[in-house]
């Protein structure tokens, strides 16, 4: 708890400094950080390799090791992502609305930082940089708590970040890492109301549920991605195959990857054999319901948990449905309100799907893999929010701000 209190107090002070920093000052510091990450590539890879070796010794699946791995190319991508954040418009100070009331007061609404943000996350060390940069750009101090499996990578990245920001004239406590990765410290952080203004968990269902059950700090939930592809009877076969392969196989370990295929009974016989052939190239394990197994002889029988799980692996659950309404009901029962897709050339069916499915992002004839700040065209994001309060969907710079009212008067008093 001592580490949390010390770093929480320092973060509060840093937040006051950051709130006054100009966009020019923040961008200059971020450009320096982008260069410093490249300069320290060798040492970052050396520390990351310690995490990789430890993960292999524990028998961690390769798909999860991929989330943990840094490479020279990935560090270049991280560095470039920092530059992309520099290019984004700074929302701080933006006046979103202004009007006069009956008392002739001029009332303005402007964007301000949230304050001190806490982020608890798991294996991906790139989150250490992404989260730091986004919070910094929006004038927020941030306290990060990564997983034990990436601790050496995170400590190395944090050292580069803090040294770089300090060299640019900012407090080292603008961005901090909790190095104690114990569950007890994580739970203490969830109750750090005295210092944290908001807590954002990024990770699997178990982590997010733990935060929701234990946190007294306000939480923005970045949900897991049990994403579905529904292939309608009016779907174009090759389009359906291409989208499914991309959504499942391009990067199965991320939250916007597809986990379940729902397919209309009228096209199941014609589509499923070709879908199976396409997925075999990636060694995807198929877990199918009874009707789908009659067509897919090499598939395994799906269990109830298969409809609920976020596999994050080359595994796909498959179910044959009688109608779009059955598909919608299945998604609303088992989905995590993240990203859902329909493949159909019938306009009315597509409209019904997007109106009835409860999710942050609903796709018509496109892959779920586009649920990402850069892919959607508004820049880097801190995570994908699956809740409805404060933010929903990819959380970019604007979602890391609050608002303040500024009222200009000329001596008015209220009668």
From Swiss-Prot:
Alphabetized CDD domains for the sequence: ALDH_F18-19_ProA-GPR
Pathway: Amino-acid biosynthesis; L-proline biosynthesis; L-glutamate 5-semialdehyde from L-glutamate: step 2/2
GO BP annotation list: L-proline biosynthetic process
GO cellular-component term (any): cytoplasm
Signal peptide extent: none
EC id: 1.2.1.41
Superkingdom, natural source: Bacteria
Disulphide connectivity of cysteines: none
One annotated GO molecular function: glutamate-5-semialdehyde dehydrogenase activity
Presence of keyword Amino-acid biosynthesis: yes
A Pfam family: Aldedh
PROSITE patterns xref list: PROA (PS01223)
Catalytic activity: L-glutamate 5-semialdehyde + phosphate + NADP(+) = L-glutamyl 5-phosphate + NADPH + H(+)
EC class name: oxidoreductase
UniProt-annotated location(s): Cytoplasm
Main location: cytoplasm
Keyword terms: Amino-acid biosynthesis, Cytoplasm, NADP, Oxidoreductase, Proline biosynthesis
Database matches in NCBIfam families: PRK00197.1, proA
Function: Catalyzes the NADPH-dependent reduction of L-glutamate 5-phosphate into L-glutamate 5-semialdehyde and phosphate. The product spontaneously undergoes cyclization to form 1-pyrroline-5-carboxylate.
Family classification: Belongs to the gamma-glutamyl phosphate reductase family.
Name the UniProt record assigns to this protein: Gamma-glutamyl phosphate reductase
Gene designation: proA
